[in-house]
Amino acid sequence: MKLKFDLKKKNGNARRGQLTFERGTVQTPAFMPVGTYGTVKGMTPEEVKGTGAEILLGNTFHLWLRPGQEVMKMHGDLHDFMNWHGPILTDSGGFQVFSLGKMRTITEKGVHFRNPVNGDKIFMDAEKSMEIQKDLGSDIVMIFDECTPYPATHNEAKKSMEMSLRWAQRSRDHFDKLENPNNLFGIVQGGVYEDLRDVSVKGLTEIGFDGYAVGGLAVGEPKEDMHRILEHTCPQLPEDKPRYLMGVGKPEDLVEGVRRGIDMFDCVMPTRNARNGHLFVTGGVIKIRNAKHKTDTTPLDPHCDCYTCQNYSKSYLHHLERCNEILGARLNTIHNLRYYQRLMESIRKAIDEDRFDEFVQEFYARRDREVPPLSKA
């Protein structure tokens, strides 16, 4: 079904809302854990839900290569395959193809590349991406686009953005031809160039989508450029549609995104960092492998209500990390995912109570850092 987006409140540029799907509701601003291969690494769906997550992200490109569309359809769709019955957003595969570097060739038609699993020659285009995502049963389908690399000259970024707009129209047309009852999001491109972002927004809104993502950021550009582009782009996006910042990010990035009007985020950071023993806490990051934690009998974060913090000490987690025990990665992941969801809960509460600016000040004070300035403050 078509999602319903209720924008309940604004506090400055920060937005408080709710997404309603047939499979459930999502409170925004929202963070989506990443389940690349149909699993949030190391977690059961019940555990992921227990951290507070209401929507997951799946990866079209990787699920197309393994296990493939036919296996997916044998189960019904991705929800049935992985036993997650809340909403799922799937990316289009564009970023993964971009990440292949020299293994791929981009043309107007689409992208030719070698399958990184077995070396076979393979082709993906806007139409194929729409077909795969329909078979996945994605509640939110992303258009097929080219992620503009950084750095890129103005001319390079312009050509990339213009092709992404043409692919956006093809994605829209094929999505409609397939009679997909779910939702299609456009992706704003244009690199770090404000004039190109303007053209992209205008083109996408003329085509018309159920929501709009800001893509091509967090690809190596300075933070100041990301903030500048967000501040420039978000006010141009339709007020009544959800806004999604793709592939972002650190806790600070989520706060800064909300400050500039973003509603949805995804990133592998909480799960990947957990597996590397980097754990997010109220005051920053704990590297649990460090020797100083060997005899520390306190929990990771006294403010955290996750299963890990309620039951285990830093000393035990340090021991598991040193011994490379699988349980360590699982407990770390539970904690990091819950940290991200608690952060979003705190952000939503602050917006509800008209004290988001105060929340931002407190957030950075706990990290002993200055609040980054708004470019257009």
UniProtKB/Swiss-Prot annotation:
Tell me which residues this entry annotates as catalytic.
91, 266
The pathway is: tRNA modification; tRNA-queuosine biosynthesis
Question: What are the GO MF terms of this UniProt record?
Answer: metal ion binding; tRNA-guanosine(34) queuine transglycosylase activity
- Annotated residues for binding of Zn(2+): 304, 306, 309, 335
Assembly: Homodimer. Within each dimer, one monomer is responsible for RNA recognition and catalysis, while the other monomer binds to the replacement base PreQ1.
State the protein's name. Queuine tRNA-ribosyltransferase
Spell out the family assignment given in the record's similarity comment: Belongs to the queuine tRNA-ribosyltransferase family.
